[in-house]
């Protein structure tokens, strides 16, 4: 990287080295890209991360097990519910605690609503980044209503701290179920409207089709997860293939990229996989709300006040909005983790940018970053 930055550029050609960031509206956080260009064509774009590093993992090792839960909200502030859940499951495995069925249903309901809200931000900002502002406003309108319901459930709109080791903090408020079902009725009509507005727009499709294609082999090799992996044609979803919580009780499809507008694995496929996932998340929430009344009322397992798991190690994996989120926790028998490691989808997504950016137009870098749906705190932690 130093050679790239310090090399003297020949004034007789159009080569330039640009800093794209670290404070740029299209980078979706404090991220920098060192872009080597030849005219309007990129030779490569190198991610330069670390601006938002906060020692989250070390904090998890010096904070008691329950005390670390609010910090997990800061790993992915756009969809914090999954960071809560992944950590809770890891500690529950160490304690050998069985979570009550109702709490598992509540985790699925809150998680899938947050997945919809996160994808609305992803597809909305993607359209805005390439020049279409109206779809972003439509997405924010729907997201704000979801945030209202999440706030009524747990008291927060962004950093939820809803999960507890052994269950969840609150049950459904009175009337909440009927309001969410009514919202889903409207939302299911909104998705076709959104498709008519932007998805099937010829200009939009041409802007994303055959751009920054990630092959199936590349996606697997770089360890991509979630919509980025499925957008490349890999049929893999933790909720279905390694089911956890209440997910074995629900019927849903896993959208996979098919080259809808161009090549399998291009920007459009990654975009449209997220659109289809919102439909499936709505379907899961419906099923959960219709059956949660059949579960016992307990929302918390019996967990000791001073959490001191036996010595051992566990790995938990959940399907977040950005793909597989994993926690590796090592216990030494005390009330603090000896080692805590989190794995997120945004970090692996960043790693592939240098490999696939060569030959793209400079303007396509914005489309590429948006299609990967990276969130800066997930990268640096």
Swiss-Prot record:
It holds the Pfam family Complex1_49kDa. InterPro entries: NADH_Q_OxRdtase_suD, NDH1_su_D/H, NiFe-Hase_large. It is a peripheral membrane protein. It is an enzyme of class 7 (translocase). SUPFAM superfamilies: HydB/Nqo4-like. Keywords: Cell inner membrane, Cell membrane, Membrane, NAD, Quinone, Translocase, Transport, Ubiquinone. Its main location: membrane. Its EC number is 7.1.1.-. It is found in: Cell inner membrane. Gene3D superfamilies: Cytochrome-c3 Hydrogenase, chain B. It catalyses: a quinone + NADH + 5 H(+)(in) = a quinol + NAD(+) + 4 H(+)(out). The keyword Mitochondrion does not apply. The keyword Translocase applies. One of its GO terms (molecular function) is NADH:ubiquinone reductase (non-electrogenic) activity. GO terms for cellular component: plasma membrane. Belongs to the complex I 49 kDa subunit family. NDH-1 shuttles electrons from NADH, via FMN and iron-sulfur (Fe-S) centers, to quinones in the respiratory chain. The immediate electron acceptor for the enzyme in this species is believed to be ubiquinone. Couples the redox reaction to proton translocation (for every two electrons transferred, four hydrogen ions are translocated across the cytoplasmic membrane), and thus conserves the redox energy in a proton gradient. NDH-1 is composed of 14 different subunits. Subunits NuoB, C, D, E, F, and G constitute the peripheral sector of the complex. PANTHER family: NADH DEHYDROGENASE [UBIQUINONE] IRON-SULFUR PROTEIN 2, MITOCHONDRIAL, NADH-UBIQUINONE OXIDOREDUCTASE 49 KDA SUBUNIT. This is NADH-quinone oxidoreductase subunit D 1. It comes from Anaeromyxobacter sp. (strain Fw109-5). The gene is nuoD1.
């Amino acid at each position: 990287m130093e050679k790239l930055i310090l090399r003297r550029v020949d004034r007789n050609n159009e080569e330039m080295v640009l800093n794209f960031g670290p404070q740029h509206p299209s980078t979706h956080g404090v991220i920098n890209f060192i872009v080597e260009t030849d005219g309007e064509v990129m030779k490569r774009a190198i991610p330069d991360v670390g601006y938002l590093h906060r020692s989250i993992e070390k904090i998890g090792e010096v904070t008691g097990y329950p005390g670390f839960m609010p910090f997990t909200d800061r790993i992915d502030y756009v969809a914090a519910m999954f960071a809560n859940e992944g950590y809770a499951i890891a500690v529950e495995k160490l304690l050998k605690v069985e979570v009550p069925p109702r709490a598992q249903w509540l985790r699925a309901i809150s998680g899938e609503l947050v997945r919809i809200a996160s994808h609305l931000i992803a597809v909305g900002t993607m359209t805005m980044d390439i020049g279409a502002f109206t779809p972003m406003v439509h997405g924010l309108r729907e997201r704000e209503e979801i945030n209202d319901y999440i706030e009524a459930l747990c008291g927060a709109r962004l950093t939820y701290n809803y999960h507890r080791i052994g269950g969840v903090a609150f049950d459904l408020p009175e009337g909440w179920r009927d309001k969410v079902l009514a919202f889903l009725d409207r939302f299911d009509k909104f998705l076709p409207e959104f498709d008519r507005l932007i998805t099937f727009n010829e200009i939009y499709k041409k802007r994303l089709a055959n751009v920054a294609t990630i092959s199936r082999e590349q996606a697997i090799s770089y360890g991509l997860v979630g919509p980025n992996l499925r957008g490349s044609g890999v049929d893999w979803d933790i909720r279905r293939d390694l089911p956890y919580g209440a997910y074995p009780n629900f019927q849903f499809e896993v959208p996979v990229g098919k080259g809808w507008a161009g090549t399998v694995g291009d920007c459009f496929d990654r975009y449209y996989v997220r659109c289809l996932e919102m439909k499936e998340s709505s379907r899961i929430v419906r099923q959960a709300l219709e059956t949660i009344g059949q579960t016992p009322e307990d929302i918390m397992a019996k967990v000791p006040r001073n959490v001191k798991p036996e010595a051992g190690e566990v790995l938990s994996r959940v399907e977040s909005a950005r793909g597989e989120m994993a926690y590796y926790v090592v216990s030494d028998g005390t009330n603090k983790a000896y080692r805590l490691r989190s794995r997120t989808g945004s970090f692996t997504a960043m790693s592939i940018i240098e490999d696939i950016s060569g030959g793209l137009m400079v303007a396509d870098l914005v489309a590429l970053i948006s299609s990967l749906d990276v969130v800066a705190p997930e990268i640096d932690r």
